Amino acid sequence: MHEMSLCEGIRGIVGDQARRHGFATVKVLRLEIGRFAGVEKAALGFAFDVVMRGSAAEGARLEILDLPGRALCYDCGEEAAIEDRFDPCPLCGGGRLMPVGGDEMRIKDMEVQ
């Protein structure tokens, strides 16, 4: 379960930010996760609760914001949202697409005190 190691990375970032900005508690942590990031959200939620014990984010509410998949179509030159990596271009039906978004995961923001 790589979600555990993802949460360990989040814990490190939270700790760094707590020291840098002087907060003691994270109330809400918002993550943006792309459609193609390969993250199992239920497993991430479980791992988050376990890994954050003893940190500034212990007991924090985790909110996950879904980011769409995006691709550049080499046939029409446009960028469009796609549901699956192998979908045709929704604008022109072309099949030569390069994914340009949807594989990211990042902390959007935190509510702290």
Swiss-Prot record:
GO terms for molecular function: nickel cation binding; zinc ion binding. Keywords: Metal-binding, Nickel, Zinc. Zn(2+) binds at C73, C76, C89, C92. One of its GO terms (biological process) is protein maturation. The keyword GTP-binding does not apply. PROSITE patterns: HYPA. It holds the Pfam family HypA. HAMAP family: HypA_HybF (MF_00213). Involved in the maturation of [NiFe] hydrogenases. Required for nickel insertion into the metal center of the hydrogenase. Belongs to the HypA/HybF family. NCBIfam families: hypA. This is Hydrogenase maturation factor HypA. It comes from Cereibacter sphaeroides (strain ATCC 17023 / DSM 158 / JCM 6121 / CCUG 31486 / LMG 2827 / NBRC 12203 / NCIMB 8253 / ATH 2.4.1.). The gene is hypA.
